[in-house]
């Protein structure tokens, strides 16, 4: 089990590192897709769109993704974290969490618990 993160400013990367699993960045690291399932942490941009870099990963590997957490800005109202809603709808990947910035400690615990409950300790 590992985490893939799509982070523009580094805040989502900081959130990902709090969870306690190996972290790989889209477009920066060699991602070991052959090592099984992963959890995705991505972001919304343009008021709720899915980043192209995330779409490229999901098109090829969505079957191995057990869940997604998405960063966003609450100032966007109904578009807050909307990329996560779209990923859930298009790829049928459970949206586990929406968070702002680098998230709070209790939010990273939500993701960690979700992963552990699926037998990925």
In which residue ranges do the predicted regions lie?
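N-terminal beta1-alpha1-beta2 submodule of the flavodoxin-like/Rossmannoid cofactor-binding fold
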Residues: 1-51
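FMN-binding flavodoxin-like domain, especially the glycine-rich phosphate-binding loop
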Residues: 35-121
């Amino acid at each position: 089990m590992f985490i893939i993160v799509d982070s523009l400013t580094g805040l989502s990367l900081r959130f990902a590192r709090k969870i306690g699993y190996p972290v790989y960045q889209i477009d920066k690291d060699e991602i070991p897709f052959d090592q099984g399932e992963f959890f995705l942490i991505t972001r919304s941009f343009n008021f709720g769109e899915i980043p192209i870099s995330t779409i490229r990963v999901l098109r090829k590997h969505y079957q191995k993704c057990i869940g997604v957490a998405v960063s966003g800005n609450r100032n966007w109202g109904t578009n807050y974290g909307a990329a996560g809603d779209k990923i859930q709808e298009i790829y049928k990947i459970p949206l586990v969490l929406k968070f702002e910035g680098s998230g709070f400690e209790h939010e990273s615990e939500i993701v960690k618990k979700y992963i552990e409950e699926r037998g990925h300790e």
